[in-house]
Design a protein with these regions (language model features):
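Conserved glycine(s) of the Walker
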Residues: 170
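Hydrophobic positions on the alpha1 helix immediately C-terminal to the Walker A/P-loop
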Residues: 174
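A noncatalytic interaction/capping subdomain that flanks phosphate/NTP-handling catalytic cores
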Residues: 1-162, 167, 177-186, 194-289
Length: 289
């Protein structure tokens, strides 16, 4: 899939490439948050995945969906449909509300070879491409003992503190309070960090090109200090979690195909392995400073 219009990236130490029939400069304009993750020179290590992107024109008519619908994510800003394609491999369709097609993805059985068409204006194309890359990363990085999380992370005294919780619980707010009141604290990522169990058995958290509405795209990693799952409550209380709840707390924020038994089992195994190496807490807290 390598051609002259190929960009190489490395996130959490793991390489992937994005190619296009458009120019490199046009592709880069759709990927401003990836600037610090770009690798100028190709390396010999095998990429997690290779993605080819076609930027659809106004006259391009998308083909109808084929195959068996496996799962649908319907969230406030986006709909994602996962298909098993008739000839093997995977298909994903991404829509923005109200059901406007933003991207079509076709991927090999192991997700390592993929082709995407992205539609709409430049903002929609950039959003769709980011979602395609995030999904491919989450689905292939598991084999390298890495999990893409929905969380907010601060760095304090050389360690990363990962705030988890349901949407609206206050993950970003909690990070901002640390930045405001605790010296020597910096934001590492505000929406989608990567946590990786390293070959030496340590657990590190990495900044990524994906940080939600907060432009925090930092290419750096630190050892994990703790995972903290937040709950709004009438009292302030922090509790150290024990297995198996500690591992379940991690996977509760991880991205992946939960409906696929084999994939979900591997997610569970990695989550429990990570939980053995670091502290996992629940923090019940008042909605104030």
């Amino acid at each position: 899939m390598e051609n002259a219009n190929t960009l190489h990236f490395r996130v959490a130490g793991l390489k992937f490439s994005v190619s296009s029939d458009a120019s490199v400069s046009e592709l880069q304009k759709l990927m401003p948050s990836y600037r610090l993750f770009y690798e100028k020179d190709a390396t010999d290590d095998a990429p997690l995945f290779e993605l080819f992107v076609h930027i659809a024109g106004e006259c391009d008519v998308p083909a109808p969906a084929e195959g068996r619908l496996l799962h649908t994510f319907d969230e406030p800003d986006i709909i994602q449909e996962f298909y098993a394609e008739p000839q093997g491999g995977h298909g994903i369709r991404i829509y923005t509300h109200p059901r406007s097609l933003a991207a079509i993805l076709h991927a090999s059985e192991d997700w390592r070879q993929a082709r995407a068409e992205i539609f709409g204006g430049k903002d929609t194309q950039s959003y769709a491409l980011g979602n395609v890359i995030m999904m491919l990363y989450a689905l292939t990085a598991l084999e390298a003992n890495a999990l893409l999380l929905h969380a907010s992370v601060v760095e304090h005294s050389g360690k990363g503190y990962i705030f988890q919780g349901k949407s609206g619980t206050g993950k970003s707010t909690h990070s901002r309070l640390w930045l405001k009141y605790i010296p020597d604290t910096a934001l590492l990522n505000d929406d989608n960090p990567v946590v990786r169990l390293m070959p030496d058995g340590t657990v590190r958290v990495f900044g990524t090109p994906w940080s939600g509405k907060t432009p925090c795209y930092i290419n750096r990693s630190v050892p994990v200090g703790a995972f903290v799952r937040l709950f709004q409550a009438p009292v302030n209380k922090i509790v150290l979690m024990q297995p198996p709840l500690s591992g379940a707390s991690i996977i509760g924020s991880a991205s992946g195909m939960r409906w696929d038994k084999e994939f979900y089992t591997r997610m569970l195994q990695l989550s429990f392995s990570i939980a053995k190496q670091t502290g996992i807490f629940t923090l019940h807290c008042l909605p104030d400073e």
